[in-house]
Amino acid sequence: LIPMYEPSNQQEAYDMVYNGFNFSEQTGEPILMRMVTRLAHSRSGVERKEQQPQNEISFSEDPRQFILLPGNARKRYKALLQRQDEFIKASENSAYNKYTDGPNKKLGIVACGIGYNYLMENYPEGCEYPVLKIGQYPLPKKQLHQLIDSCDEILVLEDGQPFVEKQ
């Protein structure tokens, strides 16, 4: 229910944390960064962004938002449900979710996080199939339907548990 970012490389991991903090500040909701072992245990140079000024210490007007006892959690859950359309819209417009068309429509590929790198390693000249790269959740429904409607079969590439595959 909360927005999640899943980087495919080190630069994306850096950028997603940077943008994730901004998104969290704008929405007042936490975000989740999904890091897989292979990416977490790797290193690479990244292009740094301009450092933002440190926020002043301020206390929340409603400290209950940080205390998730059952009564508070139920209220927060309802609020999260009401904001799903906002999160989906942000995901639809995210630069981290990218649809790339391909000439061969027999297969459509949904590549999540580092799965996208694995795919591109096998197609150094470019993939002949349509590919939907997922890096921000909730899933971008419009792009997903575009892929499903134009392809005969769908292959989902993801590291670890079948999170996207089961949705």
Residue ranges: model-predicted function:
Residues 1:
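Flexible glycine/proline-rich, aromatic-decorated loop/lid segments
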Residues 7-167:
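Flexible, low-complexity linker and terminal segments
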